Amino acid sequence: MSSPTRQLQVLDSEDDGTLLKVAFASSDRELVDQHFGSSRSFAIYGVNPERSQLLSVVEFGELEQDGNEDKLARKIDLLDGCVAVYCCACGASAVRQLMAIGVQPIKVSEGARIAELIEALQVELREGPSAWLAKAIQRTRGPDMRRFDAMAAEGWDE
């Protein structure tokens, strides 16, 4: 299993609960330039319609391109809580495992700028999210318990 060799957290992050966590497979924290399974690092950002901020960076040691899926488990665990991971490619097994924990893999062209991807995501959040993003937002908010109050106010007729 590939354990991270280094995991850095931003300590002064101001997450007020409105930030969606999004990961980027990036070697330099500026460009998406890695395949998910062989990614040597992830930059994880918090994003909402108005702002974004770096939350953490996870770096891994050398990984072999051997088809061994054990190396995926730790990466997928580290992305739990993210709504998406942007990468240059993602194998079918990794896609299934990511989707099972609610992380949407998003394939982008190698060299896509993280700042531009975040900006596009913010525009989508402001103008109306796509289906996958709307579901991700709902999952992060949890069930709306106010619906029971509305039902109680209507009363029962038997």
UniProtKB/Swiss-Prot annotation:
UniProt KW rRNA-binding keyword: no
InterPro entries the UniProt entry points to: Di-Nase_FeMo-co_biosynth (IPR003731), DiNase_FeMo-co_biosyn_sf (IPR036105), NifX-like (IPR034169), NifX/NifY_domain (IPR051840)
Keywords from the UniProt entry: Nitrogen fixation
Pfam families: Nitro_FeMo-Co
A GO biological process held by the record: nitrogen fixation
Superkingdom: Bacteria
Family: Belongs to the NifX/NifY family.
Name of protein: Protein NifX
Organism lineage string: Bacteria, Pseudomonadati, Pseudomonadota, Gammaproteobacteria, Pseudomonadales
